[in-house]
Amino acid sequence: MVIFHYISVLVPTTLAVATPYVLRRNGFDNEQKYRWLLYVACLLFFISWYLPSPLIDGQDTSFTTHFVGGGLFTGLFWAYLVSSMKWRAHWLVMAFSVFALVSALGCINELAELFMVKAGLASIKLDDTNWDILANTLGAATIWIGWIIANFMTKKGRLSGDSGN
């Protein structure tokens, strides 16, 4: 379906251009230091559309697409935003924020899928939403756990990098 090829290019390109502009415009001039996170996230989003996904319980799913392009993408996008804004909070608040972001973007995606099907722009099954939500959440959780480990190791002096200052 041609529309998905457009989405795979348009969404990450728009985010890669617009997000740094919006952050700089709002006083977050340090975002360029973390822009690589944004670019990796956008690359994962693009690649995810072309990865094969497994059958689950005999059902054709887009699990890999949602894990990589939904969850890992959102987790890295979140890490870029949090780092650029130098936002720090209790670990539980940070966990909730990444979960809220992946849930919101996942909901927008599912609504977009429904719209495209009902408008005749795409012919896809809409019965794998539960697997999509799980894949999005697992992908974002993977990034969040990596974030926690990296922060812990940086504080212990085992990793060189930004200590949050």
Identify the residue ranges that each predicted region occupies:
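Bulky hydrophobic segments
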Residues: 1-127, 138-165
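Divalent-cation-assisted or electrostatically stabilized phosphate/pyrophosphate-binding catalytic cores
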Residues: 132
